[in-house]
Every structure is written in C-alpha cells, then in structure tokens.
C-alpha cells in the first residue's frame, strides 16, 4: 500500500497542475514529495519552514482531495522538513471493543489557542467540558462566524480528553460527513452499523451543525443519536455559525435539545488578540523574519477572522524569504494589497439584503416575498425589512413593494418589533451585527 501511495504522487501532481497557476505549481508543489504512509496518513517532505506552513494552510485540502479521489479512501496529510525523521507511532493496545476516533488536527490544542475577550467564555466552557466530560455542560453549543476558532476548540477538547482518558471513545465529525455516512449506510443496508458506531461513543463532537437544515432524514437520525448519548450521560459538543434558534429549518425538538446545555459564542478578535494570534503563529511555525511593527500592521489591516489573519502572516513571511527582502510594513502592504486595498463603497440594495438574510437562514428570496407566516420565514422576513430600512434610503411603501407588495404598515410593524427585541436579546444583536457585516463585505 505504501509503494502504491508514493507512486500515485505523479497522478496527484497532474490533477493539481490543472487547479493552480503555473508559478504556484512550480514554486510549491513540485518541490515536495511523499516519503511515507502509515495509519492512513501520507507524510510529505518539504524543503523549508515557509513551504511547510504555506502548503499546510493553502494546498493541503486540494492535495488531500486529489489523493482521496485516486485512492477511493479517506487519508490525512502530515508535512515534514527535508531530512526530518518520520516517527511512526507504536500501535496502542486496544480493548476488545474497538475505539473509533476521527483524526484530530495535531495543531488544534488548548496550548495553541490564543485567548482574548472575543473567545474567553467559549474557551473556558470548552476546557471545563474537557476536564469533566458530561459533568460540566452537556451539550456544549459553540457558535460564531467562519474562521474564528470553533473547530480549533472542538479538536482541543478531543485532544485533551484522549490524553487524560485513554479508555474513552471519541468521535469528531462534520455534519456533512455524518450525512454522507448515513446516505452510504442506507445505500449499503448498513444503518445498524452506522448507528452503533456513533451511539457507542463516550464523546461526540459534531462540527457545522447548521448544514443539517433541510435534511429531514439526517435530523431524524441525529435526534435519536443525541437522545441515546445524552441518556447514557455521554458528552456532546456541537458547533455552528449561528445559535440554534437562528437555524431556520432545524426541527424544534432538536433545537430545544441543543438549548438544554450551555450556548456560547465567539466573536471577531480585537486588535490586542490579533497581535497575540500572529505572535503565537510565528512561534509555532518558527517564523523569525517578521518584526513587531509588521505584525502590528497586519493585525491592524486584517480584522475579519483568524484564518485570514494567519494566512496573511504566512504570505508575507514566504514572500520576504523567497524575494530576500526585509519584511517591513511597506512590504506587507505590497504583498497584501489585494486583501486590504481600499475598494469603492458598496451599493446596498434591498435584493442584496434579502439574499444575505435568505442565505443566513437557509431560505430563498422567494420565501421572504411569499405570504408564508410560519416563524421560520416570518422572523427572517422581519429582520430583512428592518435592515432594508436601516441600510437603504427607501420609503416604507417601497420596501413593502420589494417584499411581495406588502403594506407599509407591515414594514413598520416588522421594524418596530426587531427594534424592541434588540433591546433585550443579545443573540439577535449579534445576528444583526453579523448580517450587516456580510452585507457590507
């Protein structure tokens, strides 16, 4: 099998050459090679620290996808420096009942997580759950925007539990993978095996639960899995890009169960936290060519999420090294100009607002214009009307016309309701804040 994996690198390269530009392909991909394969992990050798970081952050997903499509099995990747020995783990003793563990990212631990005002509560709750599974908060529901560290905390919980409770069975899975496994089990008449796998876990971490919306069969299956684990006093940790009550087509019985435990959110990091994140990333990746003033510049200019922040650091460091130029703030401005360059003011229209709100709640624009009065549609419609009044110069009658020809009093009622709710609902406050951010991007 190992020789087969190594031999297929040429096939992988052929696929990758079609997906990236010629300069990137020759700079990054032709200079690395697979050197070992064990435990479903392909070890890829790279020439230096910069290549290691760049490949891991930018190209790992497409390399993994190419290998999996060729090999027809799931694999993981690990990048090592040229000349570095490959430490093959010794097989662990297993009990007679096999433990199922979905591979956790070794980078995502509590030690590598930077705590700030934007994530302090979520971090504390995650650590409490890791230290006392099923005794602190069950379930733990973590929500926040893309790239803010939810998955990092999920993996950190898994790592901590496994390090301190080796006999516990831990499963990390995305809702998309859970759905695909369910579909495959139905196709192959193996639903019993599928259920036994997840319902025998001690710890279940399920990421991006919002992707279960509109998937009725998957929601049904997860409902029973949740009940089985909860009644057996097993720990459940869930992440989402929004709180349970904002997942429009989520079944009420699932929503209520998610609200049984603790719900905590993660916000965009403030300036001080962004600086700390960049310094931690530089330390972990052995990046020594970025001075403090350049770190400060990047932290000031990249405010969206942690993923883009760390990507900017790697990009500046790699460019500085390859071009043999000092990593000054001026160089950073040059390298990141496509990310931070000032753009023309965006024209905000009602259709843009409706599309953004519809996407957020898992609806269609037609739903917002229709006569449906169910809460799963009526509330998002009221939010969209409120934003239309806040962000455009349209009159109430004009806004009503945009929403399927509704009367101006309907628009006024919607705006008044959302305004009133905002005064006492912190979750709605964050939702409006997030929607305004998406509309303005």
Curated annotation (Swiss-Prot):
GO terms for molecular function: ATP binding; ATP hydrolysis activity; DNA replication origin binding; lipid binding. SUPFAM superfamilies: P-loop containing nucleoside triphosphate hydrolases (SSF52540), TrpR-like (SSF48295). The keyword Iron does not apply. One of its GO terms (cellular component) is plasma membrane. It comes from the Bacteria. CDD domains: AAA (cd00009), Bac_DnaA_C (cd06571). ATP binds at residues 147, 149-151. Residues 103-320 are annotated as: Domain III, AAA+ region. Keywords: ATP-binding, Cytoplasm, DNA replication, DNA-binding, Lipid-binding, Nucleotide-binding. Residues 321-441 are annotated as: Domain IV, binds dsDNA. Residues 1-80 are annotated as: Domain I, interacts with DnaA modulators. Residues 80-102 are annotated as: Domain II. GO terms for biological process: DNA replication initiation; regulation of DNA replication. It is found in: Cytoplasm. Signal peptide: none annotated. Its main location: cytoplasm. Belongs to the DnaA family. Domain I is involved in oligomerization and binding regulators, domain II is flexibile and of varying length in different bacteria, domain III forms the AAA+ region, while domain IV binds dsDNA. Plays an essential role in the initiation and regulation of chromosomal replication. ATP-DnaA binds to the origin of replication (oriC) to initiate formation of the DNA replication initiation complex once per cell cycle. Binds the DnaA box (a 9 base pair repeat at the origin) and separates the double-stranded (ds)DNA. Forms a right-handed helical filament on oriC DNA; dsDNA binds to the exterior of the filament while single-stranded (ss)DNA is stabiized in the filament's interior. Oligomerizes as a right-handed, spiral filament on DNA at oriC. This is Chromosomal replication initiator protein DnaA. The gene is dnaA.
